[in-house]
Amino acid sequence: MTDGDILDLKPDLPDFRKEILKGLQSPSKWIHPKFFYDTNGSLLFDKITELPEYYQTRTENSLLIEKCESLSILLKDIESAVELGAGNGQKSFSLIKCLPGLKEYSLLDISISSLKGAVDYLKTAYPHIEIHGVCTDYLNPETMYMGDSTGKILIVFLGSTIGNMEKRDSINFLTSCNESMSRGDAILIGVDMKKDKAVLESAYNDSSGITARFNLNLIERIKREFCVSIPDGTFVHKAFYNEDIGRIEMHLVCTRDFSMTLDGAIIRFFKGEEIHTENSYKYTPDEFTEMLSIAGFPNPERLTDTRGYYSIFIARKP
């Protein structure tokens, strides 16, 4: 690829109508969290990352800055980096400073519009590094792009996105990454740690109500794309920490008996019925270290903040 190029692998986009019908016709109703991120949802999530209660983005970026010297030692031989779910490139900007031998940085994302902005931003900031964008389903190992470098490669997976996967899926994903790597290549992952329940629940129930709007935007999208009427207040936001499973759960709760017709199918809700919209798993250091080991990454390094809220794990393929 030429420096500054964007390679569009034309990923298969999910069928919103089909998957919404499937989820809402299930005995326990659900909507996949990938549908949060339409244009309005993406804007709302950007606002979430700036909220005082939402420590994850702020803490991760602080770690990349404060632990840059440690990262530069651990990753001094890395020549090429591939970031999965790069978004707007803000995380990339901080990390690139910590990779002294870097020659090439590839950003992978399913949104080509996000990639264009991120590539332009990083190319201006780092003109001496080859910056590429790849529009692809970065969670699909069959379309994983590993760059053009013949040197050591780093896979980057920040934003605690690994927590949105079920544990078994996380291990399978990490195993797929391992299988695409060569000996000595590295992986860097941002992971949200288990902590006080009140801190966790506050992060998903902010006082400004932005997270509630983000969750309820799914209802707005259903109204718009199915041309259906759903009165305001029919659903409310709910988020809580399930201590038994170790995850934040987000739901939409129906406030009254209600029915609607979607593509000819009658969808009925009873008062108090919930639509499960997202999980976000939290881990202890030992739990995530074990997951990495199972996936073929033994003895990872871990960098964390003083409170132990968030960790960056770095591991090599032996």
Question: What residues fall within each predicted segment?
Answer:
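Class I SAM-dependent methyltransferase Rossmann-like catalytic core
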Residues: 29-75
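Conserved class I S-adenosyl-L-methionine
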Residues: 77-87
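A short glycine-rich, Lys/Arg-flanked "PGG" loop and its adjoining helix->strand segment in the class I
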Residues: 171-183
